[in-house]
Design a protein with these regions (language model features):
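Feature primarily recognizes SF3-like P-loop helicase cores of small DNA viruses
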Residues: 1-178
Length: 178
């Protein structure tokens, strides 16, 4: 899917390092966004151990940020970029009020698989279907633009937030004592 998104946004995407965005020590983490891409993609990222979510929160909130590129003067920029990250590990959400929860959409595979021959045949046709794919995505969005306004990534919270799990496990005890 990420390869298809790259093809749809050819010339308007960049690749990024999610781990660098969540690290307080990497001063060049925003360098990947210097071309101000519409879409940023990381095929195999890791946000399971976010040291400092300040930079990531500011990026997904489209706030004015200071960019430090190697061998250049620092400058300020506001990035309006949609981030896609593939990962096998849950995102560690450290601050429920940070806004990351409101902006994160956790997508899991459906489990519907094609046999290898069908997969190869379909993948060969993707390039010729990009216009139809883009149109379909636009139509789905326009039919219900607010679909994810109240979305909360419950599965991701359950996989990475110990306090959330404690409350879920103890809810009936608290309710009984109340």
């Amino acid at each position: 899917v990420l390869n298809i998104i790259q093809q749809l946004f050819e010339g308007y995407y960049s690749v990024f390092d999610a781990k660098a965005l969540g690290s307080s020590s990497n001063s060049f983490a925003l360098e990947a966004f210097k071309s101000n891409p519409l879409v940023a993609i990381q095929h195999d990222g890791d946000l399971s151990r976010i040291e400092d979510n300040t930079r990531l929160n500011s990026l997904v909130s489209h706030e004015l940020m200071t960019v430090n590129e190697k061998f250049k003067s620092t400058y300020s920029n506001r990035f309006k970029c949609f981030l896609f990250m593939g990962t096998n590990k849950p995102v560690k959400i450290t601050d429920a009020k940070s806004g990351l929860i409101r902006r994160l959409i956790d997508v899991s595979p459906s489990g519907n698989k094609l046999n290898p021959r069908e997969y190869k045949a379909i993948m060969k046709q993707i390039e010729f279907e990009l216009g139809a794919i883009a149109y379909h995505c636009q139509e789905i969005y326009l039919n219900n633009p607010g679909l994810y306004d109240d979305y909360i990534p419950i599965a991701m919270l359950g996989a990475s937030n110990d306090f959330y799990n404690f409350i879920i496990d103890s809810y009936h005890v608290f309710k009984r004592e109340n």
